[in-house]
Design a protein with these regions (language model features):
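A cross-family kinase active-site recognition segment
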Residues: 248-312, 334, 362, 433-437
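Acidic, metal-coordinating catalytic segment for phosphate/diphosphate chemistry
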Residues: 2-17, 132-137, 141
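Active-site activation/catalytic loop segments of kinase-like enzymes and analogous catalytic loops
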Residues: 366-397, 411-431, 438-449
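Active-site catalytic-loop/activation-segment of kinase and kinase-like phosphoryl-transfer enzymes
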Residues: 130-154, 278-326
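Active-site acidic catalytic loop and adjacent metal/ATP-binding pocket
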Residues: 32, 174-190, 195-196, 321-370
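Juxta-kinase regulatory segment immediately upstream of eukaryotic protein kinase catalytic domains
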Residues: 117-173
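Conserved Nudix-box catalytic region and its N-terminal flanking loop in Nudix hydrolases
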Residues: 14-16, 21-71, 77-83
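ATP-binding pocket architecture of kinase catalytic cores
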Residues: 39-43, 79-115, 174-282
């Protein structure tokens, strides 16, 4: 089984065809277009592979296509033709102003489904959407922002908070991204730019706004403090804190960032109970052995693996449990983990770094956070980042202990992050599970790590 969301490097070699699914406000009809003697959904194409969550790109194009003011709710169908390098997607839209124009062309979905040029995968998705409309039942794991009416409520809250903060009038609210785990808007006001973020309530996800409010007090130079919070709904409003360092930034800048984060982790190791009380997820190493067997037996996860890979995981299970005990026996303490630490989630500020996007904030072994060092393919860059990061730890702990912990964590990080993705995949609706069903990728990294340890 293959995940359709695997990373494709040559995005420009692809074509993306996007269909607009705009329901009639009161009748079982959808907006349609005529062309070449047939009826179809309004559609457009891009000469690249477009991420389905890129609402910043998609919304203006879809508004022009439909001649309507719309919100993008979610996609209802997705099809990839890898041989032809074409991606097809149907996005469900919500009409913002409810206005109907005399020249609008509305048709029953059955008429649309007569379009044989539309891939069969899209037909299946449209049929499922129609069944959902007829039943009136919404999948319980659907993201809130994929539901009608959510955008209006969020925008009212944003405008209320901007007024409360005395930031002047709201000039625009622009969608940036919307996918299965979060939704982000850019808010332009008379006095500057703000950002709104809504996050899902999922296993191992924190209430990000509440956690940031606490971390921002502990580390005011390193963590942004929300300007406004709605914890019950997972909403927060943040200042625009500038452009991220970026994955293509200079290696020495990234190395300094890793070293700075190591020092934050070392300090956090003295504040574990307070961090847990603030809402960070408790993922201390002791829990890992109990997660191994359920993970390796989870069909949603292992269905992407070959039979020999599944067998290798089962054979490795006792060894992995022993490695966990080895890591526990070393003196490196548990600490604060970001969960997705890379230069794209960091802002450079003079002599300090600001870390954002903390939905995965947790307490566990600090080295598990260094996935982008462990997975770095450039050996020279990898060594630079590794040595700079570890140098901070070696100021406090014996070099032999630090190096052994790094060696073991270089295998077990795959287990930690596979469990993270397993929980996410089970927490979102089946339609969008492929977006984040990447536990199998980290299981392969886990097997690579086991093999490397055996060869050393």
């Amino acid at each position: 089984m293959k995940n359709p969301f695997v990373i494709i490097l040559n995005m420009s070699d692809w074509t993306t065809v996007v269909y607009a699914l705009l329901p009639h406000p009161s009748q079982p009809l959808v907006l349609a277009q005529r062309g070449s003697g047939k009826v179809s959904l309004p559609n457009l194409s891009y000469d690249e592979r477009v991420w389905v969550g890129n609402t910043r790109l998609l919304k203006p194009s879809l508004e022009k296509l439909t001649a309507a003011s719309i919100n993008i709710l979610h996609y209802v169908a997705l099809h990839l033709d890898e041989e032809m390098q074409r991606m097809y997607c149907v996005h469900l839209l919500e009409n913002r102003d409810r206005a109907l124009f005399s020249n609008d062309f509305w048709q029953p979905l059955e008429k649309i489904l007569e379009d044989n040029d539309m891939p069969s995968g899209l037909h299946r998705g449209l049929n499922s959407w129609q069944e959902e409309q007829q039943s009136g039942l919404t999948p319980e794991r659907r993201a809130p922002w994929a539901l009608p009416g959510w955008h209006a409520r969020a925008e009212r809250w944003i405008m209320d908070q901007v007024m409360r903060l005395e930031r002047g009038a709201v000039q625009s609210i622009e969608p940036i991204k919307s996918w299965s785990i979060s939704c982000v808007f850019k808010v332009a006001t008379e006095t500057g730019v703000l950002y709104f973020k809504a996050s899902r309530e999922l296993p191992f996800f924190v209430n990000e706004g509440s956690v940031l409010a606490y971390l921002g007090k502990l580390y005011p130079e390193r963590v942004p403090v929300p300007l406004a919070l709605e914890p019950e709904r997972g909403w927060m409003l943040l200042d625009d804190f500038g452009d991220p360092l970026g994955r293509d930034s200079a290696v020495d800048q990234q190395a300094r960032m890793m070293q700075d984060f190591a020092r934050l982790q070392i300090d956090s190791s003295q504040k574990i109970e307070a961090l847990l009380a603030a809402g960070c997820t408790d993922r201390r190493i002791e829990s890992l052995p109990t997660q191994i067997d359920p993970l390796f037996e989870d069909e949603l996860v292992v269905s992407f693996l070959a039979e020999e890979e599944r067998s290798a995981l089962q054979e490795a299970a006792p060894r992995l449990k022993a490695l966990t005990a080895d890591l526990l026996a070393l003196p490196i303490p548990v600490a604060l983990l970001h969960g997705d630490l890379h230069a794209g989630n960091v802002i450079r500020r003079d002599d300090s770094f600001l870390y954002f996007d903390w939905t995965d904030a947790a307490i566990s072994h600090p080295f598990f956070d260094m996935i982008h060092i462990f997975m770095e393919e450039d050996d020279t860059k990898k060594l630079t980042l590794q040595e700079t990061y570890l140098s901070a730890w070696e100021e406090h702990y014996a070099k032999a202990d630090v190096r052994r912990a790094w060696e073991v964590a270089g295998t077990l990080y795959g287990l930690y992050h596979a469990v993270s993705y397993q929980k996410i995949a089970h927490g979102i609706e089946e339609l969008v599970q492929p977006e984040l069903n990447f536990a199998y990728y980290f299981l392969r990294k886990l097997l690579e790590g086991v093999k490397k340890l055996e060869n050393n």
